[in-house]
Amino acid sequence: MAVPKKRTSISKKRIRKKNWKRKGYWTSLKAFSLGKSLSTGNSKSFFVQQNK
């Protein structure tokens, strides 16, 4: 017989939501930083071929 699960508490829900948002923030920050370093030519991890 199917039994409904207990409801997740609001505090647990907020913690999970905050972690999820924080992960997205750091990912976007890294992507922006990488894009910035590529555009200025200071990247040490990527070799971009320049068209002359």
UniProtKB/Swiss-Prot annotation:
It comes from the Eukaryota. The keyword Flavoprotein does not apply. Keywords: Chloroplast, Plastid, Ribonucleoprotein, Ribosomal protein. InterPro entries: Ribosomal_bL32, Ribosomal_bL32_plant/cyanobact, Ribosomal_zn-bd. GO terms for molecular function: structural constituent of ribosome. It is found in: Plastid, Chloroplast. GO terms for biological process: translation. Signal peptide: none annotated. One of its GO terms (cellular component) is large ribosomal subunit. It holds the Pfam family Ribosomal_L32p. SUPFAM superfamilies: Zn-binding ribosomal proteins. Its main location: plastid. Belongs to the bacterial ribosomal protein bL32 family. This is Large ribosomal subunit protein bL32c.
